[in-house]
Amino acid sequence: MFIRNNRRSKIVATVGPASSSPDMLRSLFLAGVDTFRLNFSHGARADHAEVYRNIRALEQEHDAAIAVLQDLQGPKIRIGVLAHGRLDLARGSTIGFILGREGGEGMNDIPLPHREIFEVAVPGMDLLIDDGRIKVRIMEVMDGRLVCEVLNGGALSNRKGVNVPGAVLDISPLTAKDREDLEFGLELGVDWVALSFVQRARDMIEARSLVGDRAGLIAKIEKPSALDDIEDIVRLSDSVMVARGDLGVEIPPEDVPGKQKEIIRACRLAAKPVIVATQMLDSMVSSPTPTRAEASDVAGAIYDGADAVMLSAETATGAYPVEAVEIMNRIIEKTEKHKHYRPILEATEPDVAQSPPHAVATAAANVAVALGSPVVVAYTSSGTTAARISRARPALPILALTPSEQVARRLNMFWGVVGVRSQDVHTYEASLIHAQQAVQEAKLASPSDHIVIVAGFPFAQQGSTNNLRVVQIAATDNLEIA
C-alpha cells in the first residue's frame, strides 16, 4: 500500500508530450503527483486512452489510489479570418466587428462568428482580444456590426480569442466535441470531469444530467458571472477549480487574489475540494528553478487553505516536469510546517451550521489532536464523512476506508485525506478491528497508539456520520475479524 504522508495539500499535474510516457508518469507520481489531468483541449482520444491505461498500471504497480481528471475544452470564442490575415490596431482608431467567419469590405473589419455576443452588446461594453492584450470599447451597435474604439492596440491575426467581461452569453458550456469527449472519458473511467466556461449555476445542472454520479464534477471558475453565483455553483458541483488564467483576463489582476480567497472559503464551508491553477510555476517551463514570486504564489494558496495546487504547461510541455513537481512538493511541505500555517488555517475555519454529522466530524478532528493520535480513520461509502473531517483541517492524516475504488481515488483530491479501497465491513466490532489493521498496514500508527475512528451506522448509508470511537491499537497478531 502506497501512502503519501509528508503533506496534507495535494498536487495535480497535467499530462502532455513532456510527461506521457510510462517512465515519466512513474517519476511524476513518485515526485508527488496525487491527480493526473488529461487536457482535452489538446491531443487525440487514443493518446489520452493510452495515458489513462498507463496511470492505471502505475496504480497497480504501487498499490495506490490515483485520480484521473478529464478537463473538457469548452466553447472557444474567437474572431474569424481577417481579409489580409493581419490587422494593426492603433490606439484611438475605429474598427468594426461584423457577424461572420471571414473579413468584410472595410480594411478595419474584424469577422466575429458569434451571434450571442451581438445579442448582448451595448455601447460602453469592452471586448478583450488575444488574452486581453488588445482592448476595444463598443461605441455603436448596429445590425450585424459593432463599431468600436481601440483602447489598447497591437497586431491582430486570425482566430484570436475574445473575452466579454461582465456579460453572460447565451451559450452552453458543453460543445458537441465536449459531449463526445465526456462520454469517451466516462467510458474510460475518469474520476473527475472539469467543466470550462461556467457562467452560472444552471450550467452545472446541464453537466450533471450527463455525468450523473459516474465522476466528480469540477466547476472551473473563469468568468465574472460565475463569481456572482459562486455559492450555488459550489453547491451543485463536487469540486471547484480557480482557473486564474481566463479569470485574470476578465477581471482586474488586482482582484484575483481576493477572489481566490473567497472561492477557497466557499468551498471549505461546503466541504468541497478546491484546486488553485494556472501559472503557478510557469517559469519552470524553460527553467529548472522557479522565481521567488512563484514560490510565494504556491505557498499563498496553501496558506489560503486550498486542497490542491495544479501544474499545467510545467508538466505537460515543459523541459523540467519532474523538477516542477519536486519543487512544488517541497514548497507545500515547508509551508505546512511553518509556525504561522496552523494559526492561519484555524483562524479561517468556516462557521458551519451544526448537524450531528458535522459535529461528529469536527469532534473527531479535535479529539485526535487532543490525544496526540497519529491518524483519524473514516469509514465512508460516498466520501462525505472524510470530506467533513477534512474541512476541519486536523493536523494529522485522515485514512478514508471505502469499498469503492472510485471513491478512494476521488478522496485523494481532498486536503489531508488518504483514500484507500478496503474490504466492506458489516458489523461494529469488525470495523474497529479492520481500522486497526489498516492503519498499521499503511504505517500511519503502531501498537499502543490511540486512533480515532469515525463511521456511520447503519453502514453504507450515505451521509449518516454518527459514531466516534477512540481505540488503542493492539498488535496485529491479536487482531482477527470473526
UniProtKB/Swiss-Prot annotation:
PROSITE patterns: PYRUVATE_KINASE
SUPFAM superfamilies: Phosphoenolpyruvate/pyruvate domain, PK beta-barrel domain-like, PK C-terminal domain-like
Upregulating conditions: By tartrate.
GO molecular function: ATP binding; kinase activity; magnesium ion binding; potassium ion binding; pyruvate kinase activity
Family statement drawn from the similarity comment of this UniProt entry: Belongs to the pyruvate kinase family.
Assembly with partners or alone: Homotetramer.
Protein's recorded name: Pyruvate kinase
Organism: Agrobacterium vitis
Gene: ttuE
